[in-house]
Amino acid sequence: MALEMRAPLEFWSLMPAMPALMRAPRGDGHPVIVFPGLSASDGSTLPMRGYLQAIGYDVSGWNQGYNFGPRAGILQTAVRQVRDTFDSAGEKVSLIGWSLGGIYARELAKELPDCVRCVITMGTPFSGSHRSTNAWRLYELTSGHDIEKVKDSFDLPKAPPVPTTSVYSRSDGVVAWPASLQNAQSNNPHTENVEVIASHIGLGMNPAVWWVLADRLAQQPSQWKPFSSPSGLPRLLYPDPSRR
């Protein structure tokens, strides 16, 4: 958890990085919904959503207050939000989820593939043991759910049937990074893992992560290609996820 102490530095690094971030691929106006992490609310994703709005997306939060897990009605309300957004916009919705919010984004895309354009998760533990996250006790306390029963209720490791990007950090102080790795699957060749240098708490305020979001959202699903570090940026920002 000591690794999380650097999160304020990630936030303060946004200001000097903004000129470069504003040169990221521009949005086409399609709708984006952002889901916060455990015990967090839309306030935690406000800077990120403001940036995505500024580069050309129609961005909204999940509008359900603090995220205390999939309590009664939570996922049903999220399903309605995705459907209503799709119907009102007349085009598919991109879903972004931070930590636990990424579980929602992935499962919603599995349930509503005709409504979802792409999924991007940040520090989301969907693979392996869910006790690989330091927050599992907090999850059980706040949600009232046994984490293993939740795991058994969903096929979490299975990739959604839409372009899916998992952003993770090997120095994540909350989630063990292997739990955020999407294995190659025959049901969806358009999946990838993108490694960044970030704390878990700082993922949503990290310039390298924001660039990944902009790059992935701008990509047309029919022309999907794996993320490639932009030329001119230090390779250190995006280490090779295949390295040992």
What are these regions (language model features)?
Residues K110-E111, V116-R244:
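Helical cap/lid subdomain of alpha/beta-hydrolase-fold lipid enzymes
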Residues F11-A17, D84, S88, L141-G144, ...:
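A structural signal for alpha-helix termini and helix-coil/disorder junctions
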